[in-house]
Amino acid sequence: MQHKFDELNINSTSGQKQRISSYREYFEVMDLPEAELEDRIRLAEELEPIFIWLFLLIVGGMYSKYTMQTMLQERLTLTIMGFFKIEFLNTYLQSYVEKISEEVIRVTIKNASDDYYTSVNRAQFISANETNLLGNYREQIQAIENGFRFKVWISEGDERVRHTHKAVDGTKIEILKPFIVGDSTMLFPKDISMRPSAKETVNCRCHLRYTKY
């Protein structure tokens, strides 16, 4: 099943286009360590102007889709390398940059007549969501490097949590095995490597707790 990073950014329960009030408020509910919280806020703030810039390019209509994808990939690559403190992207991150660049541009062009799709609100929503994916992936890498052997899926436990995520809340598995979430499999919340359904990833606020025993 092909993953749709953006999936029009519509909440299937409300049918309304997604907005966030602030990055701090969005991430604080996830019970992240303070350093991780600040890192995610910083990354989202760095991603936001990149997507706003992209929307302006699309509205201006001066560049081909291929040219915009290339430019977007370059900007995302530099930002992600800074977040991970690396000099080159690994295969997972390279694939991620290519897919999100293609998908966000495709959806924006398709819906360019709707002001929301080129708005600051949408840029913020995408930035927050993609920050969570990148943050969750970084945590998984760090946990493996630090010798953790197991992981536990943690949902936010409120009325916004989708039932398929409630079903795996508290599930503990070996660190390299995937979770089965609805009709999808994921190594961590928002993981794209196994082509999950967008309904299981878009606006997901779940996180993992890693343990050695």
Which role does the model predict for each range below?
Residues 1-142, 146, 210-213:
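N-terminal leader/targeting and assembly helices and adjacent pre-domain segments
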Residues 121-213:
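Acidic, glycine-rich two-metal-ion catalytic cores of nucleic acid-processing enzymes
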